[in-house]
Amino acid sequence: GSIGFSVSTLNNPFFVTLSEGAEAKAEEEGADLIVVDAGDDAAKQTSDIEDLISRNISVLIVNPVDSDAVAPAVQDAVAAGIKVISVDRVVNGVDVDCAIASDNVEGARMATEYMVSLIGEGAKTAEIQGTSGASATIDRGEGFHLVADEQLDVVSSQTANFSRSEGMTVMENILQAQPDLKGVFAHNDEMALGAVEAIGNRDI
């Protein structure tokens, strides 16, 4: 049977690379891979997965937009006897066959400790968060706050939905309210790059 790959978004270079890697491997193995882009819309992802199930796929690879919202559709796939692999983000409450992800809590904790070493304890810091409900957002936020709540002055936490353009806008707004900001922790590279554009030549 075919392999279905439901990806959270193809508007982010990381996930583009992820899907290209899957496509290259599928071609090498002679497997039929169907890639569907949820466009960061949890409801669309649910219908995408239900559609893949109706196409009688044998394997579902899922990269959730929202780790809770995707669960019922993934449970339907499991019930239909489809093997399920989650990638980069988890599916909450569903016993999938394989979960492939990095330790986002530990990664964020280490990054925040490094930031403290650069800007010093008690420095004013902002957090730019990922898409609400994504396990990566929750875990990276947890890792950041494990250190930041003890060692930094977190003056703003706002979401920019893992988007570069939103990261820039959010950062501009934060800087207007907090001109003496010393650091910013972003939940992904794209938002960080947007924040860098907003910061310009300021010493942050």
Please identify what each model-predicted range represents.
Residues G1-I204:
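A residue-level marker of the well-folded mature domains of exported/periplasmic proteins
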